[in-house]
Amino acid sequence: MQARYSVSSPNSLGVVPYLSGEQSYYRAAAAAAAAGGGYTGMAAPMSMYSHPAHEQYQAGMARAYGPYTPQPQPKDMVKPPYSYIALITMAIQNAPDKKITLNGIYQFIMERFPFYRDNKQGWQNSIRHNLSLNECFVKVPRDDKKPGKGSYWTLDPDSYNMFENGSFLRRRRRFKKKDVSKDATKEDKERLLKEHHGSQSAAAQQQRQQQQSQAQAEQDSNSQPVRIQDIKTENGTSSPPQSMSPALSAVPKIESPDSSSSMSSGSPHSIPSNRSMSLEAAESHHPHHQQHSQGFSVDNIMTSLRGSPQGSAELPSPLISSSRTGIAPSLSLSYSPGQGSIYSSPCSQGTSSGGGAGTYHCNMQAMSLYSGDRSGHLTPANTPAATTVEETLPDYSISTTSAQSHGNQEHPHQGRLPSWYLNQTGELGHLAGATYPGQQQNFHSVREMFESQRLALNSSPVNGNSSCQMSFPPSQSLYRTSGAFVYDCSKF
């Protein structure tokens, strides 16, 4: 609303005339307008449409805005379109040595741009701020030849191309000084890290390979089959391989003897063992006795029990009396060589150096089974020469042999026998001679014959060299396969 007041009128300077009590602000304004003619053009828009527009516009505007001539502002007072970085760069480049002090920068800017001649405190602070924050400006200390206040400022050699095409109006990018030392340290750190990681990876790979090799070795050791020969028994001797026949696995094992009983036997070739042995294993342990078969008899039991007082206490009274009088009855079954390996597992170890090939001595429990299976009329023998009956089977022959021929040649297997084993030997250990004539008698008649045989042995004079052997030809099988005999447990 500067058009209200005419420039030529003294009232246009904003001087309000004195207002008395009767005069109001609006009257004074109207008087000032009448004096200067400021409000004469207000009626022009009302009469604008009744007259030609061009003439009415010229008449109204000539009176309203004609006398107003605004004071023109000089071009030097306009702020230049350059940034403070560009102004500082101009000042440094215009210097003769390409370096200038802070005061020289101020003087250059004020001489070139009159806009910065006023308000010096504001823009000079901005100049100092840009000098310290931008890396493109480098501070050079003043030398002694040119004493003065302040240091020189110059441009970094890499910052001359930071403006596009030499124009200070536009900058390409913010300049960042390259720190060579920092780059070198970064490269060294990266190289060291790579080497460290490489060494760690090599060590880890080597450790993994060692672990894999150890695991594979453990698997190989676990997968190897354990040989039976490598298993040590209670007395430190290697155990023999067992027979794989399922029918022979039910035979009870013979317990290993004590060290005292084994030492008291006096036999240098006695081998203590707590497992059953086959003929092949016995031959491998005794290579100098390979022509002879194994033997187990009551003689071996008696010799082992003589060295063990505890075992002699467990014997029944008939066996104790016979051992005191020097009787060594041996019930031995002699087999042919063709059938020796079949019945090898139920019998225990004992080598014979003087007996012929094919003799095999079985334990007393097997004899009790044979007696129940092949029951018949038993003839008691009160004399050393056994008497035969007319109904005797032709395949079974009974012969009395001298215990002296076996006592010097056999290597007894010493072992303390349990009570269930000795109870069987109590009934069968005193048979001096017996025949098995027929197989038509039942078990009760066989038991009566055994009782009469035992009573006859106790009452008859004792011959210390008598023993009983039964020889089986190879044509006769030990176990009957015809099924004629039925084993009934209710009879017992």
Curated annotation (Swiss-Prot):
GO terms for cellular component: nucleus. Disulfide bonds: none annotated. Pfam families: Forkhead. Induction: By vegt, acting via nodal signaling. GO terms for molecular function: DNA binding; DNA-binding transcription factor activity; DNA-binding transcription factor activity, RNA polymerase II-specific; RNA polymerase II cis-regulatory region sequence-specific DNA binding; transcription cis-regulatory region binding. Its main location: nucleus. The keyword Nucleus applies. Residues 199-224, 257-276 have a biased composition (Low complexity). Transmembrane segments: none annotated. GO terms for biological process: anatomical structure morphogenesis; cell adhesion; cell differentiation; cellular response to chemokine; chemokine-mediated signaling pathway; DNA-templated transcription; mesoderm development; positive regulation of transcription by RNA polymerase II. In gastrulae, expressed in ventral and lateral but not dorsal mesoderm. In neurulae, expressed in the posterior mesoderm except for the dorsal midline, and also at the lateral border of the neural plate and within anterior neuroectoderm. From tailbud stages, expressed in the pronephros, heart, neural crest cells surrounding the eye, in the mandibular, hyoid and branchial arches, and within the tail. Monomer. PANTHER family: FORKHEAD BOX PROTEIN, FORKHEAD BOX PROTEIN C1. This is Forkhead box protein C1-A. It comes from Xenopus laevis.
